[in-house]
From Swiss-Prot:
GO BP: any one term: sporulation resulting in formation of a cellular spore
Subunit annotation: Homodimer (protoxin) and monomer (active toxin).
Protein's name according to its UniProt entry: Type-2Aa cytolytic delta-endotoxin
Gene it is expressed from: cyt2Aa1
Pfam families tied to this protein: Bac_thur_toxin
Source lineage: Bacteria, Bacillati, Bacillota, Bacilli, Bacillales
Signal peptide range in chain numbering: none
The keyword Transport is annotated on this UniProt entry: no
Length: 259
């Protein structure tokens, strides 16, 4: 499944003669892929990268899989930091490990609050509307239409009662475009959600529903110098054919960091 998105946004630069010349962003396709994999994957992954960097995005995601407890899908924040610190040609931009929601709130309002927090944790200025629309849709999916995700690998129902539902929900975003420059940014994040409603009702929540929520968020943003791959598509989805730690002498610099 894919949808076409054409950007009409322009930038202007000054030429040698002092005249302005428009820089027109290239059109792009937003493609959603569902592929078989022999590798354990407990993230709801969203990649916003050029094709030659899919390999890198996949293997960064696979690296952070090691921070997830396979028994209960709990995201170990300290383990994630250890993994991040061991990835070459990379740097940690920002981290977050705290409660972010403790209130009775409409889900649509909570989604906007969490989107702003993610923008802050990402630590990069990303101007792509399409990317942020994908982020918003993924956050909505953390709290709505859960009946369609009940058995997915990124969600774990860890405490249920007649008056409360608690679950883990793991997401990973990767972005590489003109805003990130010579690096790829990866943002693994985990929501620990507790809502004062029974599970059967939570499964069918919409963005217009309200409830008492407590949400803890664990996240970090890591950037790694780009290295492209021309591997056949079959090899791209086989982690055994790729080495995340191969030699790369690019230097991480000139990041477009938000304040």
């Amino acid at each position: 499944m894919y949808t076409k998105n054409f950007s009409n946004s322009r930038m202007e630069v000054k030429g040698n003669n002092g005249c302005s010349a428009p820089i027109i962003r290239k059109p792009f396709k937003h493609i959603v892929l569902t592929v078989p994999s022999s590798d354990l994957d407990n993230f709801n992954t969203v990649f916003y990268v050029q094709p030659q960097y899919i390999n890198q995005a996949l293997h960064l995601a696979n690296a952070f899989q090691g921070a997830i407890d396979p028994l209960n899908l709990n995201f170990n924040f300290e383990k994630a930091l250890q993994i991040a610190n061991g990835i070459p040609n990379s740097a940690i931009v920002k981290t977050l490990n705290q409660s972010v929601i403790q209130q009775t709130v409409e889900i649509s309002v909570m989604v906007e609050q969490l989107k702003k927090i993610i923008q802050e944790v990402l630590g990069l200025v990303i101007n792509s509307t399409s990317f942020w629309n994908s982020v918003e849709a993924t956050i909505k999916g953390t709290f709505t239409n859960l009946d369609t995700q009940i058995d997915e690998a990124w969600i774990f129902w860890h405490s249920l009662s007649a008056h409360n539902t608690s679950y883990y929900y793991n997401i990973l975003f990767s972005i590489q475009n003109e805003d990130t420059g010579a690096v790829m940014a990866v943002l693994p994040l985990a929501f620990e959600v507790s809502v004062d409603v029974e599970k059967q009702k939570v499964l069918f929540f919409t963005i217009k529903d309200s409830a008492r929520y407590e949400v803890k968020m664990k996240a970090l943003t890591l950037v790694q110098a780009l290295h492209s791959s021309n591997a056949p598509i079959v090899d791209i989805f086989n982690v055994n054919n790729y080495n995340l730690y191969h030699s790369n002498h690019k230097i991480i610099q000139n990041l477009n960091l938000s304040n």
